[in-house]
Amino acid sequence: MKPSIVAKLEALHERHEEVQALLGDAQTIADQERFRALSREYAQLSDVSRCFTDWQQVQEDIETAQMMLDDPEMREMAQDELREAKEKSEQLEQQLHVLLLPKDPDDERNAFLEVRAGTGGDEAALFAGDLFRMYSRYAEARRWRVEIMSASEGEHGGYKEIIAKISGDGVYGRLKFESGGHRVQRVPATESQGRIHTSACTVAVMPELPDAELPDINPADLRIDTFRSSGAGGQHVNTTDSAIRITHLPTGIVVECQDERSQHKNKAKALSVLGARIHAAEMAKRQQAEASTRRNLLGSGDRSDRNRTYNFPQGRVTDHRINLTLYRLDEVMEGKLDMLIEPIIQEHQADQLAALSEQE
């Protein structure tokens, strides 16, 4: 491993020990805000510190085994130990390189999840409902909280569009690669000839930003309309104009919220989603400029990107970005998404490592 990387790891390991000592200090405990910030930093440094300690121990094992090679009686055993230690050292070095990759500051944040029916009419709306259920099951398994912000139901079930806030540890980091196009191939319940239809939905995942980081929105740039909350088929949920529709005139972004009975609460929710959407649009524009010289393997997360195909007759799900096909569709639709999410994250890390190697 390069001396510069070892020096960086030593500094991080020392900082980990320093933060650990600070967390036991009475003054730190008395200052709750500082205590929370240091607790987060300690958690972030723990993996790299532990891995570096293991790597240092393996280097000592390699040194000991090399010294034993000079002893004829110990040579055979030393050769075995040396081979094992070198293999372990390589594995730990790979882990350390991944742990040192630049972190997305949004990864630990809560996220807004939007699922929108695309081409395919009623069948697309039904699939949007299936996708939202899939993500809800995944969130439940990870003990995340799901709060519906806005929902427009399909005439025969499912959703034309649904927006939810998902709260918990590392939500955005796990779900951010879900953004893009999701295609379904199956025989609709209304299809008498047994023909397979293709429908599509789009998914957008955006980090929830703290108030201090929300983009500045000029109230003069907003058109705010009120209307009555309605359920499927136009049934009125209540008789007051509590639902809110906010249009951001410069970008044309529209957000509706009708989940709460209070107009004030709906407006607050809609503004938080609007801020996240504007931020996401600005980020996409910046990433597009950065990627103009080099195409990201994982796609842009744009709605037009085709992420996955869910083929029900074959029980198959295919992630087109990394050419991964699994015949475990039933499990995926029940929320067992790690088998799809982990390979995407690993591909992203490999992409980052390759980019760093090019820079070096």
Swiss-Prot record:
Positions of the UniProt region annotated as Disordered:
284-313
- Localization per Swiss-Prot or TrEMBL: Cytoplasm
* Keywords for the protein's UniProt record, in alphabetical order: Cytoplasm, Methylation, Protein biosynthesis
GO CC annotation: cytoplasm
A single GO molecular-function term is: translation release factor activity, codon specific
Residues modified as N5-methylglutamine are Q235
Free-text description of this protein's post-translational modifications in UniProt? Methylated by PrmC. Methylation increases the termination efficiency of RF1.
Is Protein biosynthesis included in the keywords of this UniProt record? Answer: yes
* InterPro entries, sorted: PCRF (IPR005139), Pep_chain_release_fac_I (IPR000352), Pep_chain_release_fac_I_sf (IPR045853), Prokaryotic/Mito_RF (IPR050057), RF-1 (IPR004373)
Q: Which family does it belong to?
A: Belongs to the prokaryotic/mitochondrial release factor family.
Protein name, UniProt field: Peptide chain release factor 1
Q: Per the UniProt entry, what species is this protein from, by scientific name?
A: Escherichia coli O127:H6 (strain E2348/69 / EPEC)
